[in-house]
């Protein structure tokens, strides 16, 4: 549905050259909710603006629904752009227009007949839960209601793609949750492919299927949300994950663990998914295999509809441990593990 191939973007300002994107390549599948996360200046907003041609590439290809959009002239892009909706952090509503007129604006600009406009606007306002607000003005609405108007406006042309650039950053936690639930419903009901730009890992955790982590204009890590949360590879990804899930003990606790550790012990970190949590792992290790094991740390969390668990175990190097192949035991059960050095 959306594909970036070796995309580079360079901004030139007087004597200064800034490379905002560096050889970015990945694909977003149809009907996917794909998150792009990174700190300020990572290049994520520049990336999303390439999809609807608010920016153009310096080098590389951006392919949208089979069209290499950078090769099209503006007049030929119009039909493609009709299939792309976008919502922003600050809503971008027309304060002088009613809620109804704001939602209707894309249809008015495309010279849609009044009957069809009314049908589509009423449908979208009902869908986002604002049918009773259609005659009000943006200044009379809360932040969450304004974003619902923006979502209705973006969807009124029934696009295939919805771009969300920091769409929840200006909202409080409860309102953010309701907007994310609405976007998830958009994806399920209309099959819209969503590209979600954010700096909040809680947004990725709640709604996205897959995620790309960006830093300094590059994609440094990518995978399913479950994979990135369970086994982040880069320090940036680890830092983002740690903002919403305690995957390991604090530095103070780790220092305490290490002060009591010697060569007679080995520590392992384990990640268990919702099915593996049901396995009697500790019971088997202790009672069947007679290992001397202590639980130093454990944490459970929700990743979308799945419960996951993080364990930090310490094993004593006694005769039972030396005779037991722990890594084989874990691998046979498809349990992810990491020896803590």
Swiss-Prot record:
It is found in: Cell membrane. The gene is metN1. The complex is composed of two ATP-binding proteins (MetN), two transmembrane proteins (MetI) and a solute-binding protein (MetQ). GO terms for molecular function: ABC-type D-methionine transporter activity; ATP binding; ATP hydrolysis activity. Keywords: Amino-acid transport, ATP-binding, Cell membrane, Membrane, Nucleotide-binding, Translocase, Transport. It is a peripheral membrane protein. Part of the ABC transporter complex MetNIQ involved in methionine import. Responsible for energy coupling to the transport system. It is an enzyme of class 7 (translocase). GO terms for cellular component: plasma membrane. Its EC number is 7.4.2.11. This is Methionine import ATP-binding protein MetN 1. ATP binds at residues 38-45. Signal peptide: none annotated. The keyword Transport applies. Residues 2-241 form the ABC transporter domain. PANTHER family: AMINO ACID IMPORT ATP-BINDING PROTEIN, METHIONINE IMPORT ATP-BINDING PROTEIN METN. Belongs to the ABC transporter superfamily. Methionine importer (TC 3.A.1.24) family. It catalyses: L-methionine(out) + ATP + H2O = L-methionine(in) + ADP + phosphate + H(+); D-methionine(out) + ATP + H2O = D-methionine(in) + ADP + phosphate + H(+). Pfam families: ABC_tran, NIL.
